[in-house]
Amino acid sequence: MKLLIWGLSGTMGNLISVAAQKDSHWSNIAGVDAKNPTSNLKHTPEVIIDFSHPSALEGVLDYAMAHGVPLVIGTTGFEKEHLEAIDQAAKHIPVLQATNMSLGMNILFSLVEQVAGMLKNKADIEVIESHHNRKMDAPSGSAVTIVECIEKGLGEARKHQHGREGQCPREKGEIGVHAIRGGNIVGFHEANFINELETVKVSHEAHDRSVFAQGALEAAKFVVNQPTGLYHMKDVLGLT
């Protein structure tokens, strides 16, 4: 199968390329980045994996729709208008969008929703994420997804408190979200459900970025066999 990696020169783009070269499923692997535009491509891909930058989204969506190519989006840091554009594209081609491609992280998404649904208003909720010092967006896309899953379990949206300083007593019902940046941390996420008597922690730590590359390739194998629509990693992993 012919694979196009959008954002080949980036860390994840390189990892996906290396992983794909070891998998006989992929007969042709090409890449697009600032130095290698789509005009240089020799073949029309059968699936695209995008790990680039929010500013590149319009280009990848236009190309995928123009050629009718299924698309996997692993880029994070999107604004509301980006997500709306992805929703529109999914009306024309199969699109799989995920803030995290690992099996373990997607299990965590499912678990925090369940815990939130069980505890409801019986706990203060704090989400902590840690990444390497080169990560551009904060909070991480995965932390945003964790909060979304928690709110789904609660059955309501909550105020989000990003960090704390000065005189700021905790408001009842708010969800605290905290980002740590340092060194070469691959990715750590933890949801804390805290009350006066006990704390429930649900956490995940990635040891190697290749886990995201493998997940992206599995997502690509999945999305090529799907009809037009918007999909997520829980669909790939059967967690729906």
UniProtKB/Swiss-Prot annotation:
<feature type="active site" description="Proton donor/acceptor">
    <location>
        <position position="131"/>
    </location>
</feature>
<dbReference type="GO" id="GO:0019877">
    <property type="term" value="P:diaminopimelate biosynthetic process"/>
</dbReference>
<feature type="binding site">
    <location>
        <begin position="7"/>
        <end position="12"/>
    </location>
    <ligand>
        <name>NAD(+)</name>
    </ligand>
</feature>
<keyword id="KW-0220">Diaminopimelate biosynthesis</keyword>
<dbReference type="InterPro" id="IPR022663">
    <property type="entry name" value="DapB_C"/>
</dbReference>
<dbReference type="GO" id="GO:0016726">
    <property type="term" value="F:oxidoreductase activity, acting on CH or CH2 groups, NAD or NADP as acceptor"/>
</dbReference>
<feature type="active site" description="Proton donor">
    <location>
        <position position="135"/>
    </location>
</feature>
<dbReference type="GO" id="GO:0008839">
    <property type="term" value="F:4-hydroxy-tetrahydrodipicolinate reductase"/>
</dbReference>
<feature type="binding site">
    <location>
        <begin position="141"/>
        <end position="142"/>
    </location>
    <ligand>
        <name>(S)-2,3,4,5-tetrahydrodipicolinate</name>
    </ligand>
</feature>
<comment type="pathway">
    <text>Amino-acid biosynthesis; L-lysine biosynthesis via DAP pathway; (S)-tetrahydrodipicolinate from L-aspartate: step 4/4.</text>
</comment>
<dbReference type="InterPro" id="IPR000846">
    <property type="entry name" value="DapB_N"/>
</dbReference>
<feature type="binding site">
    <location>
        <begin position="74"/>
        <end position="76"/>
    </location>
    <ligand>
        <name>NAD(+)</name>
    </ligand>
</feature>
<keyword id="KW-0521">NADP</keyword>
<keyword id="KW-0457">Lysine biosynthesis</keyword>
<keyword id="KW-0560">Oxidoreductase</keyword>
<dbReference type="GO" id="GO:0005829">
    <property type="term" value="C:cytosol"/>
</dbReference>
<feature type="binding site">
    <location>
        <begin position="98"/>
        <end position="101"/>
    </location>
    <ligand>
        <name>NAD(+)</name>
    </ligand>
</feature>
<protein>
    <recommendedName>
        <fullName>4-hydroxy-tetrahydrodipicolinate reductase</fullName>
        <ecNumber>1.17.1.8</ecNumber>
    </recommendedName>
</protein>
<keyword id="KW-0520">NAD</keyword>
<feature type="binding site">
    <location>
        <position position="35"/>
    </location>
    <ligand>
        <name>NADP(+)</name>
    </ligand>
</feature>
<dbReference type="Pfam" id="PF01113">
    <property type="entry name" value="DapB_N"/>
</dbReference>
<feature type="binding site">
    <location>
        <position position="132"/>
    </location>
    <ligand>
        <name>(S)-2,3,4,5-tetrahydrodipicolinate</name>
    </ligand>
</feature>
<comment type="function">
    <text>Catalyzes the conversion of 4-hydroxy-tetrahydrodipicolinate (HTPA) to tetrahydrodipicolinate.</text>
</comment>
<comment type="similarity">
    <text>Belongs to the DapB family.</text>
</comment>
<dbReference type="InterPro" id="IPR036291">
    <property type="entry name" value="NAD(P)-bd_dom_sf"/>
</dbReference>
<keyword id="KW-0963">Cytoplasm</keyword>
<keyword id="KW-0028">Amino-acid biosynthesis</keyword>
<dbReference type="InterPro" id="IPR022664">
    <property type="entry name" value="DapB_N_CS"/>
</dbReference>
<dbReference type="InterPro" id="IPR023940">
    <property type="entry name" value="DHDPR_bac"/>
</dbReference>
<dbReference type="GO" id="GO:0009089">
    <property type="term" value="P:lysine biosynthetic process via diaminopimelate"/>
</dbReference>
<dbReference type="GO" id="GO:0050661">
    <property type="term" value="F:NADP binding"/>
</dbReference>
<dbReference type="GO" id="GO:0051287">
    <property type="term" value="F:NAD binding"/>
</dbReference>
<dbReference type="Pfam" id="PF05173">
    <property type="entry name" value="DapB_C"/>
</dbReference>
